[in-house]
Every structure is written in structure tokens, then in C-alpha cells.
From Swiss-Prot:
Disordered, as annotated region: 91-122
Gene3D superfamilies: 6.10.250.1920
Isoleucine amide: modified positions: I160
Organism this protein belongs to: Xenopus laevis
PANTHER family to which the protein is assigned, alphabetical: CORTICOLIBERIN, CORTICOLIBERIN/UROCORTIN
Subcellular compartments: Secreted
The name this protein goes by in its record: Corticoliberin
Family the UniProt entry places it in: Belongs to the sauvagine/corticotropin-releasing factor/urotensin I family.
Summary of the function given for this chain in its UniProt record: This hormone from hypothalamus regulates the release of corticotropin from pituitary gland.
Proregion residues excised on maturation: 25-119
Molecular function as annotated in GO: corticotropin-releasing hormone activity
Pfam families in the record: CRF (PF00473)
Length: 162
């Protein structure tokens, strides 16, 4: 009888714990967005944390949390990576030289022949491979989230059992 009471109490406590978004609202409003990142960094998988950092930089972390929609967070993560790649692409020396010379595109005749050869050697990534890798990353994130939830449940049961 005691065991059933403890188990039901534990289940009620776990079900009544505030979600990650609510915990962020509970914290003091005086804390800056930079102070929010360390608290989030330990509670969620790496890719979701990167998505939240991206949202935090945009200033709309709580409008759409990637933790509630993993597929949406993956899409946002991919968009963020594409933006980062575009920034890196535009900051490459060959690209800067081409833009300074007044070239309209990076594929102009003023481009270095070694860069063209390098680009020709690299095989294009298949779209199927890209989605396969994205699916695997999402599965790994879900597995990590389940493992974290199991760990927190074990800790809660240890606390209740003492």
C-alpha cells in the first residue's frame, strides 16, 4: 500500500512539474538573455540547444520553442546552418576579391582555376542522404531526450524513496 502511494505521488509530481518554457518564465525577469543560455544548455539535447540559441539571437525564444516541435526545430536549425554557410561563403577571400572587382556572381571569369577544380572534384550531396542524416539526428535527439527524462525520473524516485 505504501509503495503504491509513493508511486502515485511520484507520478503526480512529475506530471505537475512545469515545462521548460514555463521554468524560463518563473525565473527572475531581471536576468538577461545571456544568463538564460547556461540554464538551457544542460536541460536539452545539443541540436535543440543550438536552435534555442538561434531563436534567442532573433529575440523570439518563447514565441516558438523548438523543444515542443522537433521537426520544426530541425527545419529552423537547417535554415540557421544555411544562413551561417552563406555568411561564411561571402566572407571567403576569393568571394571578397570578386565582389571588390565588381563581379556579378562568384562564377565569373575572374575566379581562381584551382577553386573551380576543387569544386568540380567534390561530389554533390544527395538530397536523400541529407534527409537520411537529418532523420538520424532527430532520432538521436529523441533518444537523448528520453534518456534525460528517464534519468530525471530515477532521481525523483530516489528522492521520494529516501
Amino acid at each position: 500500500m505504501k509503495f503504491q502511494l509513493w508511486v502515485s505521488t511520484g507520478i503526480l509530481l512529475v506530471s505537475l512539474l512545469p515545462c521548460h518554457e514555463c521554468r524560463a518564465f518563473i525565473k527572475s525577469p531581471a536576468s538577461s538573455p545571456g544568463a538564460l543560455l547556461p540554464a538551457l544548455s544542460n536541460s536539452q539535447p545539443f541540436l535543440l540547444r543550438m536552435g534555442e540559441e538561434y531563436f534567442l539571437r532573433l529575440g523570439n525564444l518563447h514565441k516558438h520553442s523548438p523543444g515542443s516541435f522537433p521537426e520544426a526545430s530541425a527545419g529552423n536549425f537547417v535554415r540557421a546552418v544555411q544562413q551561417l554557410q552563406a555568411q561564411q561563403w561571402s566572407s571567403q577571400p576569393g568571394m571578397r576579391a570578386a565582389s571588390l572587382d565588381g563581379a556579378d556572381s562568384p562564377y565569373s571569369a575572374q575566379e581562381d582555376p584551382t577553386e573551380k577544380a576543387k569544386r568540380a572534384e567534390e561530389p554533390p550531396i544527395s538530397l536523400d542522404l541529407t534527409f537520411h542524416l537529418l532523420r538520424e539526428v532527430l532520432e538521436m535527439a529523441r533518444a537523448e531526450q528520453i534518456a534525460q527524462q528517464a534519468h530525471s525520473n530515477r532521481k525523483l524516485m530516489d528522492i521520494i524513496g529516501k
